[in-house]
């Protein structure tokens, strides 16, 4: 599983439509971005306070061809130059995933190009390989709107989830707390910005769970924030939103960083990779850097902001490994919203 032979200049076309970004990228050898085009739908979903699946799907239908053409143009290549097409098959919104999967199958069929299905979270993890070559064993802290997990990898293409959220993902908690503070969607960047202006003076819970557990839980924290705001309103007390944001963020980051640090020691890893949309959080990035600066034998890799949020370069990067390992999808490939990374 771990061994693969790198052919000379493998060109992979990546397609990502799992949520509210329509993205197509071209990546060389799994490490070099030739083109990376992303059409975001944030403006369309803002007024609803979250992603509306039906609207997301319609946007993907409108954008996919344009984004695909733009990526090929930016990379200055034709379909003849592509070794394989890598597409997100799951997890995600089923309607949104279908647009990308069907586009990938159509291109693969029309131009007789091999097809590879990619797990969305594997993509987030492999975004780090576009920054630096990964070394095994490694640990990835995946923090996004739908996922919060610690993934152990002993070799390429091998994923073991050693910790995951038991309820809300961290990104989900961020969005719900932002809504409580009347901030626009997506809430994460707004909370992060506000947190830097405040002080963590409000006592909020941290869910450590069992002593040896690497799992996460954020629903209690989210409820505590909502209750704090509600109780203050009832008593006519003014709570500084920046202090509440700072207190909430510190609670989330404390648990994420402590558990990642403990797992890195226990599994004796060479690298720790940050992955997922919440990886763009400045507070989290800073705390991880401080924590891992103290560990001599562990290298921390944090991708640039552009590779934290959903993009297709990461899907192409993960797809390169799958392609080189001989994995192929047939034209029966389907969207799988509940796809398991360990499968």
From Swiss-Prot:
Residues in coiled coil: none
Cofactor-binding details, from the entry: Binds 1 Fe(2+) ion per subunit.
Enzyme Commission number, as recorded: 2.3.1.234
Location in the cell: Cytoplasm
Biological process terms in GO annotation: tRNA threonylcarbamoyladenosine modification
Cofactor(s) in the UniProt record: Fe(2+)
Keyword Ion transport: no
Residues engaged in binding substrate: 142-146, 175, 188, 192, 281
Keywords of the record: Acyltransferase, Cytoplasm, Iron, Metal-binding, Transferase, tRNA processing
Keyword Secreted tagged: no
Transmembrane domains' residue ranges: none
Gene Ontology CC terms, in alphabetical order: cytoplasm
Sites where the protein binds Fe cation: 120, 124, 310
PANTHER family: TRNA N6-ADENOSINE THREONYLCARBAMOYLTRANSFERASE, TRNA N6-ADENOSINE THREONYLCARBAMOYLTRANSFERASE, MITOCHONDRIAL
Family to which this protein belongs: Belongs to the KAE1 / TsaD family.
Protein name in the entry: tRNA N6-adenosine threonylcarbamoyltransferase
Organism this protein belongs to: Bacillus anthracis
Taxonomy of the source species: Bacteria, Bacillati, Bacillota, Bacilli, Bacillales
